[in-house]
């Protein structure tokens, strides 16, 4: 990925930001693209939106280091603009390789760019967020991007519903059983 020159985004960046976390995680979060802080540090979701994502994970008792977090594009779009469809398309080879290597059972799509790129170009996050979609044995949950929640805090209750739904799906699929007891079984520990 470091040598990638498939689109023009790589020309004005400090770092490519492939993603980080548990490379064997059954849960993957996919956002839009790196922001300024991520570009400077070379790590995904470490700026204000990443700090909010960490708090959202903590709210459902899921340590951040137990999931994998990445973005559709691996280079920061100028001015933090939405990646162009051709930029997202160029980066899909990297995302496909990540999902193939990690093999998540559940993917949370953070924001409309991730949902439009991976589900449907006509996807509308305000209408379709929070609805589970199963593709090739992988469950996907589109929800608001944390940066959208920072811009519009009135969406936080819906995002909280989605996080509770995520927790319930992880229980249903018997994932993170050391953290979540499956329905009807005693709590671990």
Over which residues does each language-model region extend?
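A polyanion-binding, active-site-adjacent surface
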Residues: 1-189
């Amino acid at each position: 990925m470091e040598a990638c020159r498939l689109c023009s985004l790589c020309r004005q960046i400090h770092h490519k930001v492939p993603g980080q976390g548990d490379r064997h995680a059954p849960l993957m979060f996919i956002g839009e693209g790196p922001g300024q802080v991520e570009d400077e540090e070379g790590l995904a979701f470490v700026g204000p939106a990443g700090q909010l994502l960490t708090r959202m994970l903590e709210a459902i008792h899921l340590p951040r280091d137990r999931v994998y977090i990445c973005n559709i594009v691996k280079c920061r779009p100028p001015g933090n603009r939405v990646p162009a469809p051709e930029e997202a398309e160029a980066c899909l080879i990297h995302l496909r390789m990540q999902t193939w290597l990690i093999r998540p059972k559940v993917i949370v799509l953070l924001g409309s760019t991730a949902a439009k790129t991976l589900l449907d170009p006509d996807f509308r996050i305000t209408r379709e967020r929070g609805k589970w979609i199963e593709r090739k044995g992988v469950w996907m949950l589109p929800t608001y991007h944390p940066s959208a929640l920072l811009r519009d805090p009135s969406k936080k209750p819906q995002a909280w519903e989605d996080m509770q739904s995520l927790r319930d799906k992880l229980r249903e699929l018997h994932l993170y059983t050391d953290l979540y007891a499956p329905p009807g079984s005693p709590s671990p520990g």
